[in-house]
């Protein structure tokens, strides 16, 4: 039986998880669980969580979710947030205080898609 060599590239080894749901159960039982495992288990070299839409408000109100995100950040997950969404909910400053990279996300997400980065949406 032959051995297949797999050569990874930056885009093959990058995962972007777009989290838009305001449902804390979706965050805990799907979004955060997979995102954190992907980084801890080295399924991807780079893992980024993008906070977009109603999730921006939820994360500023839920201490349990905040701790889970801090744990992910500690383990190397990068966290970005949509500035327009954060401003809609009045939480941009809070997200920045949590260490999130709060910025306009339309162009970066489009760039991720064009470059072939793996993207999941919850």
Regions found by a protein language model. Name each.
Residues 2-17, 25:
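Secretory/periplasmic and organellar redox-cofactor proteins
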Residues 28-41:
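Histidine-anchored nucleotide/phosphate-binding helix
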Residues 35, 46-52, 79-85:
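Short internal beta-strands
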Residues 71, 80, 96-111, 117-118:
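A short aromatic-anchored loop/beta-hairpin motif
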Residues 120-122:
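Aromatic- and Gly/Pro-rich donor/ligand-binding loops
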Residues 63-92:
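A glycine-rich helix N-cap at a beta->alpha junction
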Residues 4, 11, 49, 57-61:
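N-terminal beta1-alpha1-beta2 submodule of the flavodoxin-like/Rossmannoid cofactor-binding fold
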Residues 16-31, 54-60:
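Short, glycine-rich nucleotide/cofactor-binding loops
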